Amino acid sequence: MTKMVINPNRKLSRINRQIYGHFSEHLGRCIYEGIYVGENSPIENVNGMRTDVVEALKEIRVPVLRWPGGCFADEYHWMDGIGPVGSRKKMINTNWGGVLEDNSFGTHEYFELCRQLGCQTYINGNLGSGTVREMSEWIEYMTFDGISPMSELRGKNGQQAPWKVDYFGIGNENWGCGGNMNPDYYANEYRRYQSFVRDYNNEHHIQKICCGAPHEDYEWTKEVLATCFRRTSEEQHGFMDGLSFHYYVYPEGIEIKGSSTEFDENVWYKTLNKAVYIDELIRRHGKIMDEYDPLKKIGMIVDEWGTWYTCEPGTNPGFLYQQNTMRDALVAGITLNIFNKHSDRVKMANLAQIVNVLQAVLLTEGDKMIKTPTYHVFDIYKEHQDSNLVESSIETEMIGVEEEWKVPNLTESVSETADGTLHLTITNLSVDQSFDIDTTIIDRSVKTVKGEIVTEEIHAKNTFEEPECVTVKKYDGTQITEKGIRFTIPACSVLHLEVR
């Protein structure tokens, strides 16, 4: 019998709802077809946004949406995406498939989408190929509530009132597609550009996100922070509110990657091992951040994460379209548990990407839409949003095929909502073994337990022909005990228990 202990008396940190955020880039069929079809489309829409997609995303309480990139952000010139749709300047999307971008989805459309979703805004600015003036004028266009050239232009384009920009990224992946910069050079450019990202509304601070490292690039983290903190006061905390971090799970490596649907048990465990590895990366990058920011005023912003496979056969390789199986559900559950556990430092995360790209929560084909296994994990984890992380631990054992890629059999996180309800989310990484778990809940008498679970065999997926092969199912296998609860978690599953 596996032992688990929960201590609700020890509240460790608040789990920001933004940890459950998403990412939408002008890439493949994410924006166009996936989200935006235009007002004249036969597909049901409101102001051009697909009704089915918006309603599905509202169900999982999308808290924040990043846009327009990604690598696209550092080639995006915002003025090309405003004004009458038919007269907007076109461009070639050189990063993603070399296709024509008509800019019919721009600033106004993005804010309309966020309005429909009821989510916060996270805009990534163009440092790589844009100017300081261009970035400054975009902020003025979006947020200035007064008479100015940019606010008047906004009004001319149909939006009199300013919008709220909650987060603004100063460049993206500037160590790579955003300019191939060295860390000290980028950091100095960051300091310059962010100076002109002004808070025109004193009651609403725009949180500035500095471009952080990919994977194990600890040198980037160290040098960017050193340069940003040089000759500054403690109150300025490096001129930033957040430092981004990107991590993708490539099962077979960055070159080959591997199939999204055809894999054996060893590749299953290899993939999950790489998902678990993000815990070490957060700890090590976080330790460097602690040297400069011991009070944790700067959030770690994991604004790109997820699985990355070889594209589906017959699709444009620049569109990054991939299927989604129970393997992705486990990656999502594992990763979100880790983010919860590090919520003292991790303040936002954005799954890549929201529709039709990489580890998407939704896939579309014409007027059809399906929810992926990853979607259902976000659905059963949504009660963690803005709850308090409480102290918890569970006994684990290492499982797998090859020694190098073994993983802990279980991961977990526990939060408490304002009304005292405990929410346990647990993943079972085993292909074929269930585990009995005896849980002690300190100083708490359990009255009721509700459960829901996402579980199927490891290759299970939803398709347009069979859209509900993987869904959320009711789980009623919990027994209330004198000290807490006892339950069995099936193989290859993600479980949520609501304990009152």
Residues covered by each model-derived region:
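Active-site His/acidic residue clusters
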Residues: 249-270, 315
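Histidine-centered active-site/metal-ligand motif
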Residues: 246
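Active-site-proximal helices and loops of the catalytic beta/alpha 8
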Residues: 250, 272-275, 279
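Non-catalytic accessory regions flanking glycosidase/transglycosidase catalytic cores in CAZymes
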Residues: 1-242, 278-311, 315-500
